[in-house]
Regions:
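Compositionally biased terminal segments of proteins
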Residues: 1-176
Length: 176
């Protein structure tokens, strides 16, 4: 799935939610992973599904139909604690569902926890490297109230630190 297909799928989900819920309520969904990077225009590779970290309970029954994966909530501790403070609205006119992505820096932190090849490749894309706010990323990794506060195990946090320091050493532009 590429960006246009992804936006179309989100639009269709919103339309179905509008048919199912004929009141004034609005729902929310936070998109992470490769789909979020597509929506942030920082990768161009296709992605198979949409990973949602959070979605309003009422719409969760619709998500499977649109191949939206909520199983990533098991990895919530791979995101910095104050993720919600940095959500990026998806530019899509909707009637029922407000879509957001995690910030690029929050996604990079989550992918630095991962050992999967596709996650590593995602954060090495030239678009990601050019768009990262390295000061924000550094804050998310080292601040006691961010990645460390949400880490499930100290050993995993130490692994994140190691991966981040290697990533920073190799890819952060000089002078930053």
């Amino acid at each position: 799935m590429v960006s246009e297909e992804l936006l179309q799928r989100l639009k269709l989900l919103d339309e179905e939610a509008e048919l199912r819920f004929d009141d004034d309520r609005r729902f929310r969904m936070i998109i992470v992973g490769g789909a979020a990077l597509l929506l942030l225009d920082t990768i161009s590779r296709a992605t198979r599904d949409i990973d949602a970290l959070d979605a309003t309970a009422e719409i969760q029954t619709l998500l499977e139909k649109y191949d939206i994966n909520m199983r990533v909530t098991a990895y919530m501790f791979h995101f910095p604690y104050n993720l919600e403070d940095r959500l990026v609205p998806v530019r899509l006119l909707t009637k029922k569902i407000d879509y957001y992505t995690a910030s690029l820096e929050d996604i990079v932190v989550s992918k630095l926890y991962s050992e999967r090849d596709t996650d590593r490749q995602d954060i090495l894309s030239p678009e990601v490297l050019a768009a990262i706010d390295w000061d924000v990323l550094e804050h998310l990794v080292y601040d006691e109230d961010e990645a460390k506060a949400n880490a499930y195990f100290e050993q995993e946090y130490q692994s994140l630190l190691y991966n981040y320091e290697e990533y920073r050493r190799r890819y952060r532009p000089c002078g930053n």
